[in-house]
From Swiss-Prot:
The lineage of its organism: Archaea, Thermoproteota, Thermoprotei, Sulfolobales, Sulfolobaceae. Belongs to the eukaryotic ribosomal protein eL39 family. Gene3D superfamilies: Ribosomal protein L39e. The keyword Ribosomal protein applies. One of its GO terms (cellular component) is ribonucleoprotein complex. InterPro entries: Ribosomal_eL39, Ribosomal_eL39_CS, Ribosomal_eL39_dom_sf. Keywords: Ribonucleoprotein, Ribosomal protein. The gene is rpl39e. GO terms for biological process: translation. This is Large ribosomal subunit protein eL39. GO terms for molecular function: structural constituent of ribosome.
Length: 51
C-alpha cells in the first residue's frame, strides 16, 4: 500500500487496528464469563477490510 494515504483512510485503518484486539481479562471477570472473546476479531490474511 502506498505511503501517502488520505487522512480519513488512515483514521479508519487505525480504528480497525485498535478494534482487532482480544477483550481484557477484567471484562471476562466482570461479566462472570458471559463475554469470553471478541466476535469481531479479524485476521489480516483471511478477512478484507472495506475501508
Amino acid at each position: 500500500m502506498s505511503r501517502n494515504k488520505p487522512v480519513a483512510k488512515k483514521f479508519r485503518l487505525a480504528k480497525a487496528l485498535k478494534a482487532n484486539s482480544p477483550i481484557p481479562i477484567w471484562i471476562v471477570l466482570k461479566t462472570r464469563g458471559r463475554v469470553r472473546y471478541n466476535p469481531f476479531r479479524r485476521n489480516w490474511r483471511r478477512n478484507d477490510l472495506k475501508v
